[in-house]
Amino acid sequence: MATDLNRKRSATSGSLSVTNPNIKATNRKPARVYSVSSDIVPQALTHPDEDVHLKTSKSPHDAAPRWSQVGFQSIFHDGSNARRSTDSIEEEYSQGTENNDGHSEIGSSSSNRMEGNTTSNDSLFSSNSRGNKRRLSIFTNSKDNMRNRSRSGSKNYGTVITGTSSNNISRSGSKLFHTKSNMSVNSLQSSLSTGHSHSNKGSNVFSKMAKKLLPYKPHNSIGKDDVEPVVPSPFSKFLHSSYGKHRSPVQFIHTSTGGLIDSGKSVYSFNPSINNNPNDTALSLIQDDAFDATNVSLLHDLLKNLPSLIANYKSFTVQELFVLEGNIWGIYCSIVVELFKNKRVWQLPAKIEDIDRLLEFYITLKTQTKAAVTHSRFLAEIEEFITTSLYILENQIVFNYANEDTVNTALKRVGIIWKVFYQQVYYDMMAVLLPFEKSFQKNSNYWLDGYLSEPSRYAPSIDVLLLKCFRDSIILPYYESFLHTNDGASKSFQRYIFSEEEQNGVTEEDKLTLLQCFGILNTIKGNSRNQRIIGELLEGIRMSI
């Protein structure tokens, strides 16, 4: 049998062999069992005659076993640095299992004590064949604990290889290692949990060897790998769409804080100390000091990292540039829209210089990078923001105005909206949009063509842009119908003003306010249909005075 064992041993195993306790060895030191690691790992083994030999007195030599008898040594102990192949390890393990099952003395006693769950692992670390059967682990529990564990039917007492039950080992045959082809989630989870329970004594021997032979990540056997987190950088969060979850102007405006239709808070109302009559429409603007805390935090965070973004934006990909543009524009609009909600420029949560620097960088991204867009698309984006903000201004005035008679009169309502816009919003927006004015002048080749609908040689400007948006979003919806009358828009508008004077008490002050409004809007150069309507309205209001 010994000859047979030596013949079947792998060529790379060196002096490693499995010792059969029933064969007497001649002039040989206790054989070292097949080693797997240089680490000292405790092993809990049960021998059939352990109870008998534990009762006998032990010699001093038995009380202090030498490390050479324990059976732990490096897999490179022979100095050849040759690793054992997986096939040779499995073959030797299978041979040891067959030899162990062939001896009735060991097999019968082990099966009686362990209720049929004994595997070849129980005799892996045995003593020599002279009958001096020693206990091979100096780190194991007491005799009583081992006996109780054996009799309790626990399936963990013989798991010195993978921590699984002997039934699982017998079903898996000689497959010691769980590879991608034969791994089982349940068995590997059991192995991991068992190995963890004995972590205070040492790591599993075969698990360590498997990690060396088959490198793997510990969590691969449990489930899918989690996405590796992006290495943080000062500005990396601005390159991902999840940051801030920027929204389009329509979305963030109608979901932001402010006195809207359903807010139950009056933003624009008459001053209680002033007589509320239609001819005296002095407004008392109620301040709403609360800024959205999230928007303010995002703005300050962006301003803090703005120098790094400016220094590194040329190395960003096209996708990263698009995401960065969206985040910057979303944060900028969420702050500037407050100017249409009864805020002044000095009440914004950042200095006007910082807000302008942020907009300058945004203009650079949209005009001079790989993610640049056409001038018409860029202007349409700006106009969309201004137009939607003007709708907010109109809604706040119309639905929060105290005098319903004044609001229900179209001429007076337009006059109130114009006053608030031209006396307050217009100049504040000129300040925060100043970087656009600089870009219109410095980069005229980019902005010149296609600004107005008709062919034009006029370069765009911020004041024209604001007035144009006010014309299209506020004025034309009220008075566009006068263009289709038989007598012409100017004549029809004049008759309409006279009727409003008689029915709704339109005063000279109201007409002068409209004269200022239409006169300033008429300064927009061009010959578009919308501009022709403004010219007709201006002529009609002049004739009515």
From Swiss-Prot:
One of its GO terms (biological process) is TORC2 signaling. Residues 1-24, 78-166 are annotated as: Disordered. Residues 11-24, 106-130, 151-166 have a biased composition (Polar residues). It comes from the Eukaryota. GO terms for cellular component: TORC2 complex. It holds the Pfam family HbrB. Disulfide bonds: none annotated. Interacts with the target of rapamycin complex 2 (TORC2) subunit TSC11 and the TORC2 effectors SLM1 and SLM2. This is Probable target of rapamycin complex 2 subunit BIT2. The gene is BIT2.
